Design a protein with these regions (language model features):
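GH16 jelly-roll
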Residues: 1-149
Length: 149
């Protein structure tokens, strides 16, 4: 296992309250659920397990191009996982180690957090907060992070 340096801001008051080391053979349904509500015009998010798997201690998320011969449209299937029902906290920090593809016209990898008030079921949007820790827009030179209120 590669050693990753601890962030400088961590102190002894922090306690690990949620983690997944992906050491099993399949995605743990007690920690993760598929989210088919996220989509884009040419991407159909799916709960198809062919798009997500555990491999060598890593979560692998894929998208698959749908070959529609003769069509000018390009569609693909992707997957979106959420911890909505298993990881809700008011304070703290989150971290992830990831290998991100930079493919033009391909996937849109992202790592978001959302407040409970802004997602299923849609409650008062005035209280919704979304933090885009990162979003990759198919360019090796562009990485976005945003706070939405």
């Amino acid at each position: 296992m590669n050693e990753i340096a601890k962030p400088a801001f961590l102190n002894s008051d922090y306690k690990l309250v949620w983690h997944d080391e992906f050491d099993g053979n399949e995605i743990n349904p007690d920690k993760w659920s598929f989210n088919s509500a996220m989509s884009a015009k040419s991407v159909l998010n799916t709960e198809n397990k062919e798009n997500a798997r555990i491999e060598n201690g890593k979560l692998v998320l894929e998208n698959h191009r749908i070959d529609d011969s003769g069509s000018k449209c390009r569609y693909s299937t992707a997957t979106s996982l959420t911890t909505y029902d298993t990881m809700n906290y008011r304070f703290g920090y989150v971290e992830m180690s990831a290998k991100i593809p930079f493919l033009y016209g391909g996937p849109w990898p992202s790592f978001w957090t959302k407040s409970i008030g802004g997602i299923r079921p849609r409650t008062n949007k005035d209280y919704m907060v979304e933090v885009d820790i990162f979003e990759v827009f198919s360019s090796p030179n562009h990485l976005a992070y945003t706070l939405h209120k």
